[in-house]
Amino acid sequence: MNFRYSIDATNKFKKDIKRIKKRGYDMALLKNVINKLAMGEPLPAANKDHALAGNMTGYRECHIQPDWLLLYIIDDDCLVLTLTRTGTHSDLF
């Protein structure tokens, strides 16, 4: 697999992953979305990928499942995909 972006994960994202695993979420779904993002491929419309506004300007959000989100930043200058948070709407907002 050739990734266009290197992948970086924040410490908060790593903690979120532990919580999501305990809840029994299908980690393969998350991995699939992360791989598509890292390869620079567009996500399917079902993932509802969009930019955030306000104090979250610069971040993007997509849905892994209806109430499971991934927050991330893509830096095209450095070719880095930074995974910032994952969880439910109530976990993140």
Can you say where each PLM-predicted feature lies in the sequence?
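Basic, Lys/Arg-enriched alpha-helical interface segments
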Residues: 1-66, 75-81, 86, 90-93
